[in-house]
Design a protein with these regions (language model features):
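Short, Lys/Arg-enriched, disordered terminal segments
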Residues: 1-4, 235-236
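ABC family nucleotide-binding domain
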Residues: 5-214, 219
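Conserved beta-strand-loop-alpha-helix hinge in the C-terminal portion
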Residues: 218-236
Length: 236
């Protein structure tokens, strides 16, 4: 095992059976993601990006191959072990926020801290994401960008080692999307969190420390980007 790698995938494949048809969503994926990196996984719709994210996040187990997290093989975990792995180590950020509509922003964030052994201070988290005065507002009273910020706050409040972000700008306009990317980079740089962004939007790869391209379930590129671009200078 490479001690500098937080994630290491070794020949990982994932097949889904739909009736008599087998669909191979991942095919012999082998790559690593370094501790503290901001990685962008880039690929078109249906390329296997979400399957890969689910595998990294312990939401799904591979059909074959191994996934190592901090040198430990999580692909052999039981359901209970996977649940503990997700609770302790992973913060998820989704395209459509997935907030509880009947809870305020603060309550949505508090929900995540209830399952954490070492949660962050909620007022500090809300201030970090720029919503310290919006904690008592409900999702319906907030813009899409604000809701995504709450979703990010919920993800980091339980103090995970990793943020896994599935198309975090997909439902946002350009200006709001850039603000979300700036926030994710800030969390990566200032809090030391490993951030993995899944996206079909190619320009976003410019901000990454590592770029992973996936096509038809196969990893076709895994490279370091030695000169990441400030998200504020990225256009799409």
């Amino acid at each position: 095992m490479n001690e500098d790698l937080l994630f290491e995938l070794d020949d990982v494949s994932k097949e889904y059976v739909m009736g008599e048809v087998k669909v191979k969503a991942l095919s012999s994926a082998s790559f690593g993601i370094g501790r503290g990196e901001l990685a962008v996984v880039l690929g078109p719709s249906g390329s296997g990006k979400s399957t890969l994210l689910n595998a990294l996040g312990g939401m799904d187990i591979p059909s074959s191959g191994k996934i190592y997290f901090n040198g430990i093989d999580i692909s052999s975990y039981t359901e209970k072990q996977l649940t503990n792995y997700r609770r302790k180590n992973i913060g998820f950020v989704f395209q459509f926020y997935n907030l509880m509509p009947n809870l305020t922003a603060r309550e949505n964030v508090e929900l995540a801290t209830e399952i954490s052994e070492n949660p962050l201070d909620i007022p500090e988290v809300l201030e970090r994401i720029g919503l310290k005065d919006r904690g008592d507002h409900f999702p319906a009273q907030m813009s899409g960008g604000e809701q995504q910020r709450v979703a990010i706050a919920r993800a980091i409040a339980k103090n995970p080692e990793v943020l896994l972000c599935d198309e975090p700008t997909g439902a946002l306009d350009y200006t709001t999307g850039v603000k979300v990317l700036l926030l994710l980079r800030q969390i990566n740089r200032e809090m030391g969190k490993t951030v993995v962004i899944i996206t079909h939007n190619q320009p976003i790869a410019q901000m990454a420390d590592r770029v992973i391209r996936i096509r038809s379930g196969e990893i076709v590129e895994n490279r370091l980007n030695h000169v990441p671009v400030d998200p504020g200078k990225i256009e799409w």
